[in-house]
């Protein structure tokens, strides 16, 4: 009616959601999309007998993580898959990483994702990941830095080790701002750089961060290849509704890497304790299958291999995932979606803007009958090419978790 406020799509979806006993499983193969090397992408080069067996029973298509031509970070691309508009809900990597390793944060705290990196004598970053140092070495360096630098200009600083070269840095004090540029060139072969405040109010915070970077690099001179630090994703805890509030779901997450656990926790998922292997993640899914109605299962190895430019390694990771597929299907979820959060072609050694293939299984799909789970096969599916933001809607619909819209 005239004069009435028009509901947004998000509000409509929330009004249609109902709670049922159907089980939804979203399998995210991180960075699964690729580009051809000698005529084949990583998915096309992989030997995947189980994908080939199950794919004909699915409906398929291609999804754009954020929008046409935009290369997404892992945060925005996952948010979209979970049903959150990444342009509306912006969550910094620092907060995601911090929550993923159970670091307590207040609304005043500023968190950043950190890398130990290798700096040459000319101030050039020659390896952003310091050769992927062992996690044990990471813990040793973090303990050293934590004792060496406890505060800068009255701001308390805590460092927390992650996996391999990764860590989380938390600044605690009043008036800290998160509108800062990344202190990370994002590519090897470029000069190390500090952060800049994007507002007048953020300049003081930028000064504190840059002083920390200088002191940390001086302290790490004898720790080659981990002789400097890079920081990005400066962020504070945002306001965001939970998946339970939005979709009437009881969601749980199974992921081995902190960032993904942190993002899942932010949207209200229960974080399930799991092991480090794909097999252990699937065993966790089995163990808790009766307790929740939505499961997010994350597999990381494909993305790591892609970022390393390791085409064969990514193919091997895809084949490893293929081997555990029957165990997931054996659980008989009412809806199963298999896709990626973004593409990470080994030829680019980074995330890219290319769409990801998706398979959707339920009792209510019209199977496409495709022979393989690849970019080329999925582009001909009846789902077509659509935004990742709509994946959760399709899953809810196929799980009979949405009421009819309108009269």
Ranges and model annotations:
Residues 2-407:
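Feature captures the catalytic ectodomains and active-site-proximal regions of enzymes
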């Amino acid at each position: 009616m005239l004069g009435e406020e028009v509901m947004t799509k998000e509000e409509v979806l929330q009004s249609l959601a109902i709670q049922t006993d159907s089980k939804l499983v979203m399998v995210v193969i991180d960075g699964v999309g690729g580009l051809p090397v000698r005529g084949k992408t990583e998915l096309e080069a992989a030997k995947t007998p189980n994908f080939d067996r199950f794919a004909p029973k699915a409906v398929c298509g291609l999804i754009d993580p954020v929008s046409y031509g935009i290369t997404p970070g892992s945060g925005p691309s996952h948010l979209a898959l979970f049903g959150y508009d990444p342009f509306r809900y912006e969550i910094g990597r620092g907060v995601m990483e911090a929550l993923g390793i159970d670091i307590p944060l207040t609304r005043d705290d500023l968190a950043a994702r950190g890398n130990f990196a290798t700096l040459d004598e000319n101030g050039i970053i020659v390896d952003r990941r310091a050769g992927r140092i062992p996690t044990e070495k990471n813990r040793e360096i973090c303990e050293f830095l934590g004792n060496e630098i406890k505060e800068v200009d009255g701001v308390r600083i805590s460092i927390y080790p992650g996996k391999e070269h990764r860590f989380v840095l938390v600044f605690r004090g009043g008036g800290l701002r998160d509108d800062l540029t990344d202190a990370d060139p994002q590519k090897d072969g470029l000069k190390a750089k500090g952060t800049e405040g994007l507002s007048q109010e953020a300049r003081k915070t930028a000064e504190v961060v840059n002083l920390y970077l200088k002191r940390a690099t001086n302290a790490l001179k004898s720790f080659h290849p981990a002789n400097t630090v890079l920081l990005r994703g400066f962020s504070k805890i945002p306001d965001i509704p939970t998946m339970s509030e939005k979709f009437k779901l009881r969601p749980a997450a199974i992921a081995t890497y902190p960032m993904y656990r942190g993002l899942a926790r932010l949207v209200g998922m229960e974080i399930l304790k799991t092991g480090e292997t794909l097999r252990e993640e699937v065993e966790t899914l089995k163990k808790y299958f009766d307790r929740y109605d939505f499961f997010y299962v994350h597999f990381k190895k494909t993305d790591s291999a892609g970022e390393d430019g390791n085409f064969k390694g990514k193919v091997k990771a895809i084949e490893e995932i293929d081997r555990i597929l029957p165990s997931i299907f054996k659980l008989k979820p009412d809806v199963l979606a298999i896709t990626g959060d973004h593409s990470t072609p080994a030829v680019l050694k980074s995330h890219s803007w290319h769409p990801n293939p998706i398979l959707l299984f339920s009792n209510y799909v019209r199977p496409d009958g495709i022979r393989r789970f690849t970019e080329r096969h999925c582009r001909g599916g009846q789902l077509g090419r659509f935004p990742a933001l709509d994946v959760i809607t399709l899953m809810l619909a196929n799980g009979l978790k949405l009421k009819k819209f309108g009269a």
